[in-house]
Structures are given as structure tokens and as C-alpha cells.
């Protein structure tokens, strides 16, 4: 590579962040619709603020879903169960404004029985471009900064829910990780870690400064050092823990939350392009979601097969049309075995069917088993082995295509 050493940063937020509360409610609603009717068409958006939840969007389904119950159950499981949070699962208002999907969209997406190939009958739910990415930074083939950032807030939530240590934790938190890379795009060290977590008021007899010092030490020892490999931390690594001090007011009372506002947290932490479409609350006929999952699957299998150290995949669609308008693969000059990007792309297009119904069937997106959409709505949609688009079952086929 021609560039010199450089720094790269990614952030994440916990399940208690207001935007993630919204994402999880939207996906919990989607899960229930799909459970009752796998052919449900759902576009569910959620707004949360002080003492209030609004769920809106468009649905075509045979299912009947109790929005109140799902919203309150989700909020309870996240941990907003106390009146002092000013957003409480038992007392907040829940307004449902879901209505029927436009028949104009339905007509383009739903099956056209006169077409012979079943996978050609189901068109994309919208136009747009989606990206997938993989690299050799981590065993999960994810960029390291976002992977560590996700794990930090996930562990923080686990500690909070366990309730054995750090019992002052409240649900809202954020993380940020800055890595230093060498000239060959290999991670050298962690330069900085930022963690901000909501917490209870300081205990009686303890000053704010003393309490923040306790929080800082707890997070460094019980969270950061458990997540970040020790060899990446050195004497120059900086830890910024609750850098503004007190963080008692948080969650939907501190900031309004909306579905779909954490699309970089949901994906690759800025290490790869993003087509702009959010995931949560959307059924799998919407290629914003399903094709992004498929593009990750393609990229991950290419890297796992040893064809490249990095891979970006772009796929684009026209509404109502099943076959992608375009497919683009870029290995960023890291291709192996003398393979060009065009050679890799030609074989990948033959191996991976990127028509919407083919994607849905490959990953059972209309009948999730062993996972649910709400699982995806916090801590990232990628780099987590429970999801079917993370499988590398196409590695042998890719290698065989090149005689490897």
C-alpha cells in the first residue's frame, strides 16, 4: 500500500440508546408480523421521547399484532423499568399509527404467476444500492474498530443486567475506538477508547469527582480490558470515560430516538460505503435490508476463501425487478493468486443468486430460526455468528471455481 500509518475510528451505542430502543421496537413488531404471516410486508418506524412511544408505518399482513404489548415488553427487556428514568415501560404512552401498504408497491413486489422462474416473480421492494464488506482485521472478518466498539457496549449491558458489579449502571451508553494501522493496513495498536455510560446519582457521602473516578476505573478494568486484546493497549493508549462528567439523564428522556438513525453503527463503522437505507422495521422483501445481508455474505465468503484480504460488494436494484441492475466487486488491491476483481466478480455472480426471493430463501429471512430480527437491532447486523448471512459455506465452491 502506498499510504503511511494512519488512524481509524468507529463508534457504537448500546441497546438503551434512544435510537436503538426505536430500532428494537420496530424489529420486535416485524418479528411478530412475520411469525404470524411469513409473507407480511412491513415498514415499521418508531419514535421515542420522554414518556412516549409512537409506532407508525405501512403493513400488508394476515397477522394481528398487539403493538402496546410488544413495545412495553421490548422496553422492559432493555431495562427502562423505573419512573426516575422518565421513560418507563409500564407508564409510557404507546400510540400505534400503522396502516395499509400502498397497493402500487404491492403490485411490483408480489409474485407474478405468469413468469416461469419462481425467483423472477418477486421484484425488489424499492430501488437503491446496498453494500457488503469483509476484511481480515478480526476472526469475524469485520473491521476491528467497529467490532471492538460493539463488544464494549454489549459487555456493558451484560454487566448491567447481571447486576453483580457496577450496579449504578443505567441503560444508555456509547463507545468509540480509535485504532492505529500500519502501512499494510494491519492493526498496530489501540490509540483511544471512549465510553460514556448513563448511571445512577452518586452515593451519599461521595463527591461527583470521586464517583466518576470509580466509574472510570470500573469500565477500564471490567469492560475495556476484557474486550480489547492486551497486546493492542500500550502506555500511550488514551481512555476517555464519561468525559463530560455526570451522565444521569439519558435514554429517550435525554434524546429523542428514531428508527434508522444508526446505520453506520449497524454496519461497518464507516470502514465501507453505505447505500443509505436503514434495516430495522423492514421485512425481507425490502432490499435495503436483505440485499445488504446478501452483499455481506458474498464479501465474507470471498475473504474467507483467501481470494482477497478486503472486499467491498455493491448491488443495486430497480423497484419491481428481480434481477440486480448492477453488481460491483472491489478487493482494494488485495486480491490473491493473481486474480483480478473482474475474475472474482464473474465467479461470484454465478455462485451467489442475488434476486430478492433467492436471498430470502437462502437465509430463511421469512422464517427466522435460531435468531430474530430484534436480535440484529443492537450491537450490529454483521460479525455475529448466529446470523445465517455470516456463514462461509460457499468457500469450497469459490475455491473450486478457481482451481484452488
Swiss-Prot record:
InterPro entries hit by this protein: ADOMET_SYNTHASE_CS (IPR022631), S-AdoMet_synt_C (IPR022630), S-AdoMet_synt_central (IPR022629), S-AdoMet_synt_N (IPR022628), S-AdoMet_synthetase (IPR002133), S-AdoMet_synthetase_sfam (IPR022636)
Localization terms from the record: Cytoplasm
Coiled-coil parts of chain: none
List of residues binding L-methionine: 58, 101, 255, 286
Positions that bind ATP: 17, 172-174, 246-247, 255, 261-262, 278, 282
KW ATP-binding (keyword) present: yes
Annotated positions binding K(+): 45
Pathway listed: Amino-acid biosynthesis; S-adenosyl-L-methionine biosynthesis; S-adenosyl-L-methionine from L-methionine: step 1/1
Biological processes per GO annotation: one-carbon metabolic process; S-adenosylmethionine biosynthetic process
Gene Ontology cellular-component annotations: cytoplasm
Subunit comment: Homotetramer; dimer of dimers.
Protein name as it appears in the record: S-adenosylmethionine synthase
Protein species of origin: Chlorobaculum parvum (strain DSM 263 / NCIMB 8327) (Chlorobium vibrioforme subsp. thiosulfatophilum)
Amino acid at each position: 500500500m502506498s499510504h503511511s500509518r494512519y488512524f481509524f475510528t468507529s463508534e457504537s451505542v448500546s441497546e438503551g440508546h434512544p435510537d436503538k430502543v426505536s430500532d428494537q421496537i420496530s424489529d420486535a413488531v416485524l418479528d411478530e408480523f412475520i411469525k404470524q404471516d411469513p409473507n407480511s410486508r412491513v415498514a415499521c418506524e418508531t419514535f421515542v421521547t420522554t414518556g412516549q412511544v409512537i409506532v407508525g408505518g405501512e403493513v400488508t399482513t394476515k397477522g394481528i399484532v398487539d403493538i402496546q404489548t410488544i413495545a412495553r415488553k421490548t422496553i422492559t427487556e432493555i431495562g427502562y423499568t423505573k419512573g426516575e428514568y422518565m421513560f418507563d415501560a409500564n407508564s409510557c404512552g404507546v400510540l400505534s399509527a400503522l396502516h395499509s401498504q400502498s397497493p402500487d408497491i404491492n403490485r411490483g413486489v408480489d409474485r407474478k404467476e405468469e413468469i416461469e422462474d419462481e425467483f423472477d416473480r418477486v421484484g425488489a421492494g424499492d430501488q437503491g444500492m446496498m453494500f457488503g464488506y469483509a476484511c481480515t482485521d478480526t476472526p469475524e472478518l469485520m473491521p476491528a474498530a467497529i467490532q471492538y466498539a460493539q463488544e464494549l457496549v454489549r459487555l456493558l449491558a451484560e454487566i448491567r443486567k447481571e447486576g453483580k458489579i457496577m450496579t449504578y449502571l443505567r441503560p444508555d451508553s456509547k463507545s468509540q475506538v480509535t485504532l492505529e494501522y500500519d502501512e499494510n493496513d494491519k492493526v498496530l495498536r489501540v490509540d483511544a477508547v471512549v465510553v460514556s455510560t448513563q448511571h445512577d446519582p452518586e452515593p451519599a457521602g461521595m463527591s461527583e469527582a470521586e464517583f466518576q473516578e470509580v466509574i472510570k476505573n470500573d469500565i477500564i478494568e471490567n469492560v475495556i480490558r476484557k474486550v480489547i486484546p492486551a497486546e493492542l493497549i500500550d502506555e500511550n493508549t488514551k481512555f476517555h470515560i464519561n468525559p463530560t462528567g455526570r451522565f444521569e439523564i439519558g435514554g429517550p428522556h435525554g434524546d429523542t430516538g428514531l428508527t434508522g438513525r444508526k446505520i453506520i453503527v449497524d454496519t461497518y463503522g464507516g470502514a465501507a460505503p453505505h447505500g443509505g437505507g436503514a434495516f430495522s422495521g423492514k421485512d425481507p422483501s425490502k432490499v435495503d435490508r436483505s440485499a445488504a445481508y446478501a452483499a455481506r455474505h458474498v464479501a465474507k465468503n470471498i475473504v474467507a476463501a483467501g481470494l482477497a484480504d478486503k472486499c467491498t460488494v455493491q448491488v443495486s436494484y430497480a423497484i419491481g425487478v428481480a434481477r440486480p441492475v448492477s453488481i460491483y466487486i472491489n478487493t482494494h488491491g488485495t486480491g490473491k493468486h493473481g486474480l483480478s476483481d473482474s475474475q472474482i466478480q464473474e465467479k461470484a455472480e454465478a455462485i451467489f443468486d442475488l434476486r430478492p426471493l433467492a436471498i430470502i430463501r437462502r437465509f430463511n429471512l421469512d422464517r427466522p430460526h435460531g435468531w430474530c430480527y430484534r436480535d440484529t437491532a443492537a450491537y450490529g447486523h454483521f460479525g455475529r455468528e448466529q446470523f445465517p448471512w455470516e456463514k462461509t459455506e460457499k468457500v469450497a465452491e469459490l475455491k473450486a471455481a478457481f482451481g484452488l
